[in-house]
Amino acid sequence: MDKVLNREESMELMDLLGLERAAWGNLPLMRKAYLKKCKEFHPDKGGDEDKMKRMNTLYKKMEQDVKVAHQPDFGTWNSSEVCADFPLCPDTLYCKEWPICSKKPSVHCPCMLCQLRLRHLNRKFLRKEPLVWIDCYCIDCFTQWFGLDLTEETLQWWVQIIGETPFRDLKL
């Protein structure tokens, strides 16, 4: 996500969206703010045309580069495939046993917390650059990106974002 826009562009986009810079990378929140600001800046509604154009340019560039970063698209999926990989209970889908899963991921645990952390460890050895949030959706990248401690509250914020993220983007 840090390679999508340069620093000045990302700061400008966050200012135009009216969001704190710490929210950079929270794509569902950014999308919601973008739609709200489109109504506010729209020239037909008496808004600032220049701000609207600049916001559109930056947002579309960010959106396109995020899509490219998440290529290749592996096609469609159906719910029976997902259910086979993960437990049906939504409480254990993201984290089966707190704090056990938060301390050490288990290859035998089907929760997303463990699976994404194990995926992070595997991918880390295949890349020269370090993995960062949006490149990797594990809770470690999340806490590092947003500067948070690993707590149950942080887990809840992570679960909320993961829950709104398309499954194929998780790269599981």
UniProtKB/Swiss-Prot annotation:
Domain J: 12-75
Subcellular location field: Host cytoplasm; Host nucleus
Glycoprotein in keyword set: no
Zinc finger (C4-type): 101-114
Keyword Phosphoprotein included in the entry's annotation: yes
Keyword vocabulary terms for this entry: Acetylation, Activator, Early protein, Host cytoplasm, Host nucleus, Host-virus interaction, Metal-binding, Oncogene, Phosphoprotein, Transcription, Transcription regulation, Zinc, Zinc-finger
One GO term describing the cellular component: host cell cytoplasm
SUPFAM superfamilies: Chaperone J-domain, T-antigen specific domain-like
Pfam name, any one: Papo_T_antigen
MF terms (GO), sorted A to Z: zinc ion binding
Residue positions where N-acetylmethionine is found in the record: M1
Recorded domain comment: The common region of ST and LT proteins comprises the J domain. This domain is essential for multiple viral activities, including virion assembly, viral DNA replication, transformation and transcriptional activation. This domain is also required for cyclin A-transactivating activity of ST.
Function: Promotes efficient viral genome replication by accelerating both G1 and S phase progression of the cell cycle. Inhibits host PP2A by binding to the A subunit, thereby displacing lower affinity regulatory B subunit. Inactivation of PP2A in turn results in the transactivation of cyclin A and cyclin D1 promoters. Late during the infection cycle, ST may induce dephosphorylation of host MTOR, leading to the inhibition of cap-dependent translation. May establish and maintain high levels of viral genomes during persistent infection in cell culture.
Protein name: Small t antigen
Taxonomic lineage of the native organism: Viruses, Monodnaviria, Shotokuvirae, Cossaviricota, Papovaviricetes
